[in-house]
C-alpha cells in the first residue's frame, strides 16, 4: 500500500481539494452495498461525522472486503470527490485498503443498534467508540481546555495540590485511606486504635477530598491560583449525581470578598458554557437531538441574564410559601436544613427560571473555614444553582481572623495538631480571600445534557464498581 500522510476525517470533511489522493484511517461504523459497489462509513474519533468510502467490489475483491465489518480498523487511500448522495458533501473513492484489525460480528458488542447506558457502562473500555461517548469525551476535552484558558488569560497560576493528604477539608471523615500495611495484621494500642507511626507516611493518610486548603496557602503567596485535579469521596451514594472519584476546579483569590467570589464564579461558568457553544456545536447538536431536546436552549438560557443573588433565609421563605400553596417536596423545608437537589431546582427552574447564587448559609451546615457574618448564625458561603443540576459550584469567603478561626476549630473538635500549617497563614500576614469549587463532571452533565454523572467520565468509580 502506497504511503500517504494521514488526514484526519474532521479535516477531510472540510476539504475541497477534489481529485487529490488522501489517506484516512479509522474504525468501520457500517459497510453496506451491492455486488458492484460497497459504502463504508468510517470514523476516526476526530468528529461526530463519518466519511463515506466508496469501494469498487470488482477492483478490491469480495473476499478481501468480507472482514471489513462494524468495528474493524482500516487504512484507506483514495480520491477525494464531491458526494452525490445525501448527508455528506465529500466522499472518498477507494483505491487501496489495508485492514489493521477485524471485529467478529458474533462477539463485538457495539453492533449497529441502540444500546442502553447501563450496558455501555459495563463495557466502558469500548464505549468511547460510540457516537454518544465520542461526543461526550470531545466535549470533556474542550471544557478542560476552556478552564485552563479562562484562568491563564486572567493571570491565575495553576497550582498542583497533593493527592495523598493527612487533612480532611470537608470535615466529613468520608475519605479513602492510603496504607502499605497488611490490613489483616494492623498494630493497635491498648485502646484498640491503629498505630500509624510505622506506616509509610508515619501517620494516617488518605486520598484528598479537596485541594482547597493547600490552594489557600498558595493564594496567600501568589495572589490568585486555581487547582484542577482528581478528588475522592468515600460516600456510599448510588445516585446519578455522585461519584467516588471525580475532578474539581478550585480557584482561590487573595483580597477577594464574597461579592468578588460570586462575580468570578458567574463569569467563569458563563465562559465555559459559551466556549462549548462556540467550539462543540456539532457534538452538542447530536446530544440535543438524541437525548435532550432542550439542551441548546438551556445552554443559551444561562447566558442571557445575570444570576439571581439570593440569601439562604429568603430562599427558605420561598420554599415554605410553595409548600403552603400545595407544592410537595420529598424532603422537609425549614431554616437550618441543607437544601436537597429538589429544593435547589425549584428555586432555579420554577421560581426564578434562571441560575441562582444562594448565599449566607447557616454556619452549622457549612465548613469550619468559612467567614462568619455579624449575625453570628450565618457564614459568607455561596452555592451556584443551575437548572437540571442543582448545586454546581460551592464556595465562600474564608475566615481570615486567626482567633475566630481557632474558636471555630475548637467548637467543632478538629485536632489542632492537624491544622498548624493552615493556621500559619492567619498568623503571618493574613488577608481576606475567597474561593470556590466546581465539580467538573457536574459542569459536563449540564453541557452535555446527559442524565447520569457516570456517563461523563471515562471510567466511573462508584460503590461496588472499580472496573478497568
Swiss-Prot record:
Annotated keywords: Aminoacyl-tRNA synthetase, ATP-binding, Cytoplasm, Ligase, Nucleotide-binding, Protein biosynthesis
Gene Ontology cellular component terms for the protein in this record: cytoplasm
Family note: Belongs to the class-II aminoacyl-tRNA synthetase family.
NCBIfam families documented for this protein: asnS, PRK03932.1
One GO molecular-function entry: asparagine-tRNA ligase activity
Single GO BP term: asparaginyl-tRNA aminoacylation
CDD domains listed in its UniProt record: AsxRS_core, EcAsnRS_like_N
Subunit structure, as described in the record: Homodimer.
Location within or outside the cell: Cytoplasm
Protein name: Asparagine--tRNA ligase
Catalytically driven reaction(s): tRNA(Asn) + L-asparagine + ATP = L-asparaginyl-tRNA(Asn) + AMP + diphosphate + H(+)
EC number: 6.1.1.22
Cited Pfam families: tRNA-synt_2 (PF00152), tRNA_anti-codon (PF01336)
Amino acid at each position: 500500500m502506497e504511503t500517504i500522510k494521514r488526514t484526519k476525517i474532521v479535516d477531510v470533511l472540510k476539504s475541497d481539494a477534489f481529485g487529490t489522493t488522501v489517506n484516512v484511517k479509522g474504525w468501520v461504523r457500517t459497510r453496506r452495498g451491492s455486488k458492484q459497489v460497497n459504502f463504508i462509513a468510517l470514523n476516526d474519533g476526530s468528529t461526530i461525522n463519518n466519511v463515506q468510502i466508496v469501494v469498487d467490489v470488482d477492483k478490491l475483491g469480495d473476499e478481501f472486503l468480507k472482514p471489513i465489518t462494524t468495528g474493524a480498523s482500516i487504512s484507506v487511500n483514495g480520491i477525494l470527490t464531491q458526494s452525490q448522495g445525501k448527508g455528506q458533501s465529500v466522499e472518498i473513492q477507494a483505491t487501496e485498503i489495508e485492514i489493521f484489525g477485524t471485529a467478529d460480528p458474533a462477539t463485538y458488542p457495539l453492533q449497529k443498534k441502540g444500546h442502553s447506558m447501563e450496558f455501555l457502562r459495563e463495557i466502558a473500555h469500548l464505549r468511547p467508540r460510540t457516537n454518544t461517548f465520542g461526543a461526550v469525551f470531545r466535549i470533556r476535552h474542550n471544557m478542560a481546555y476552556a478552564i485552563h484558558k479562562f484562568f491563564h488569560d486572567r493571570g491565575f497560576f495553576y497550582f498542583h495540590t497533593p493527592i495523598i493528604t493527612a487533612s480532611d477539608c470537608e470535615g466529613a471523615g468520608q475519605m479513602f485511606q492510603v496504607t502499605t500495611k497488611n490490613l489483616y495484621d494492623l498494630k493497635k494500642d491498648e485502646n484498640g486504635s491503629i498505630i500509624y507511626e510505622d506506616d509509610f507516611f508515619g501517620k494516617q493518610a488518605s486520598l484528598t477530598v479537596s485541594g482547597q486548603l493547600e490552594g489557600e496557602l498558595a493564594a496567600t503567596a501568589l495572589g490568585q491560583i486555581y487547582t484542577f485535579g482528581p478528588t475522592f469521596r468515600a460516600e456510599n451514594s448510588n445516585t446519578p449525581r455522585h461519584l467516588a472519584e471525580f475532578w474539581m476546579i478550585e480557584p482561590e483569590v487573595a483580597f477577594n470578598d464574597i461579592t468578588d467570589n460570586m462575580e468570578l464564579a458567574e463569569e467563569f461558568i458563563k465562559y465555559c458554557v459559551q466556549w462549548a457553544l462556540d467550539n462543540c456545536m456539532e457534538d452538542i447538536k447530536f446530544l440535543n437531538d438524541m437525548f435532550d431536546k432542550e439542551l441548546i436552549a438551556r445552554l443559551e438560557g444561562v447566558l442571557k441574564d445575570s444570576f439571581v443573588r439570593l440569601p439562604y433565609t429568603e430562599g427558605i421563605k420561598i420554599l415554605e410559601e410553595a409548600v403552603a400553596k400545595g407544592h410537595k417536596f420529598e424532603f422537609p423545608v425549614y431554616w437550618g436544613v441543607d437544601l436537597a437537589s429538589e429544593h435547589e431546582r425549584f428555586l432555579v427552574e420554577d421560581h426564578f427560571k434562571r441560575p441562582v447564587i444562594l448565599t449566607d448559609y447557616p454556619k452549622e451546615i457549612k465548613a469550619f473555614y468559612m467567614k462568619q457574618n455579624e449575625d453570628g448564625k450565618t457564614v459568607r458561603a455561596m452555592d451556584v444553582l443551575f437548572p437540571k443540576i442543582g448545586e454546581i459550584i460551592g464556595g465562600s469567603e474564608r475566615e481570615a481572623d486567626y482567633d475566630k478561626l481557632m474558636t471555630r476549630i475548637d467548637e467543632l473538635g478538629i485536632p489542632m495538631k492537624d491544622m498548624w500549617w493552615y493556621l500559619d497563614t492567619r498568623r503571618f500576614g493574613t488577608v481576606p480571600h475567597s474561593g470556590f469549587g466546581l465539580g467538573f463532571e457536574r459542569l459536563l452533565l449540564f453541557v452535555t445534557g446527559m442524565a447520569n454523572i457516570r456517563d461523563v467520565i471515562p471510567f466511573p468509580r462508584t460503590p461496588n464498581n472499580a472496573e478497568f
